[in-house]
Regions:
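Acidic, low-complexity intrinsically disordered segments
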Residues: 2-8, 14, 40-77
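N-terminal acidic leader/helix
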Residues: 2-40
Length: 77
């Protein structure tokens, strides 16, 4: 991140969960909770299967989420 540039998102919490998917059944995963935009108080969650989790993968998925959905956050329709 460039000097003076504000962060777009802040990872708040990372924790393991058990979740249910109708196609796969019960599985273990890692929940990534992040605030976007920073300071807004809006929190979002991404679940990554436990086998796929690495800190780098979590960061990549948060960035991917922001690119895909971040543009509509806060828009008045």
């Amino acid at each position: 991140m460039a000097e003076g540039e504000k962060p777009k998102a802040r990872i708040i919490r990372i924790f393991e969960i058990s979740a249910f998917d109708p196609e796969r059944g019960t599985f273990r995963g890692v929940n990534i909770r992040f605030e976007y935009p920073v300071g807004s108080g809006n929190y979002h969650d991404i679940v990554i299967p436990l086998e796929e989790y690495t800190p780098e993968e979590a960061e990549r998925r948060v960035r991917e989420w922001i690119q895909k959905y971040g543009g509509i956050i806060g828009k008045t329709l």
